[in-house]
């Protein structure tokens, strides 16, 4: 299983983005979390198979109808960083 960190930039706070991510992650069987960051972006930590994480990345680039995603940055999550079992909203 791979673990990735996505930073989603744009108009992504105050539009139900984290709850939308939770629904997508739950449907895909992804473990991790979503949280708002002070700079206005949303951080998503996700663990799953490569194909499932690729689908999640595609979905994050679209976002829910009220969001305006400008870009999604992707990076690896170090092995020592614990990923929650299930999917949490912080």
Which residues does each predicted region cover?
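Intrinsically disordered, low-complexity, mixed-charge
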Residues: 1-90
């Amino acid at each position: 299983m791979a673990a990735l960190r996505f930073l989603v930039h744009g108009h992504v706070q105050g539009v139900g983005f984290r709850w939308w991510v939770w629904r997508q992650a739950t449907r895909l069987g992804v473990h991790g979390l979503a949280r708002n960051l002070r700079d206005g972006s949303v951080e998503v930590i996700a663990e799953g198979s490569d194909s499932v994480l690729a689908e999640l990345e595609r979905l994050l680039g679209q976002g829910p109808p009220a969001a305006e995603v400008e870009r999604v940055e992707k990076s690896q999550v170090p092995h020592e960083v614990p990923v929650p079992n299930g999917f949490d909203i912080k």
